[in-house]
Amino acid sequence: MIDFDNQTDTNLDITLLESIATFLSPREVELILLDDEAMRKINQEHRGIDKSTDVLSFPLEGGDFLPLGSILLSIDRVRAEAELRGHSIEAEAALLFIHGMLHLLGYDHEYDQGEQRFKEEELITRFGLPSSLIVRTEEL
């Protein structure tokens, strides 16, 4: 289940994201949709990086009764990548949501020898997302 906090004026259909979340975990996930400036501020505050990014994830520790964590998406980045790659903003949001969910579940592409990327490709295929998103996973 997704607790969706849309802080933008963009309408995003999260039906597919709900299916992905349910498939990956029985725990609730918070999804926050932000603009680039809000994302930049959060990235600076939590990671010391003074620029925006497409997705951030913040896991919650403490047991199976708490939400899994929070995933933040920059709608500006989602929209730009979707246009560049020729797919919908929902498809791009799904890729970034998958990426964030896997981080919440303990995957870390910086250290895991490609396990997260492989899992992302598997989920892209499973949920019928455009194959162009598989190429996109190489850049995340």
UniProtKB/Swiss-Prot annotation:
The keyword Metal-binding applies. GO terms for molecular function: metalloendopeptidase activity; RNA endonuclease activity; zinc ion binding. Signal peptide: none annotated. Zn(2+) binds at H99, H103, H109. Coiled coil: none annotated. Its main location: cytoplasm. Its EC number is 3.1.-.-. The keyword Membrane does not apply. One of its GO terms (cellular component) is cytoplasm. Its cofactor is Zn(2+). One of its GO terms (biological process) is rRNA processing. Binds 1 zinc ion. It is found in: Cytoplasm. Pfam families: YbeY. Keywords: Cytoplasm, Endonuclease, Hydrolase, Metal-binding, Nuclease, Ribosome biogenesis, rRNA processing, Zinc. InterPro entries: MetalPrtase_cat_dom_sf_prd, YbeY, YbeY_CS. Belongs to the endoribonuclease YbeY family. Single strand-specific metallo-endoribonuclease involved in late-stage 70S ribosome quality control and in maturation of the 3' terminus of the 16S rRNA. NCBIfam families: rRNA maturation RNase YbeY (TIGR00043). This is Endoribonuclease YbeY. The lineage of its organism: Bacteria, Pseudomonadati, Campylobacterota, Epsilonproteobacteria, Campylobacterales.
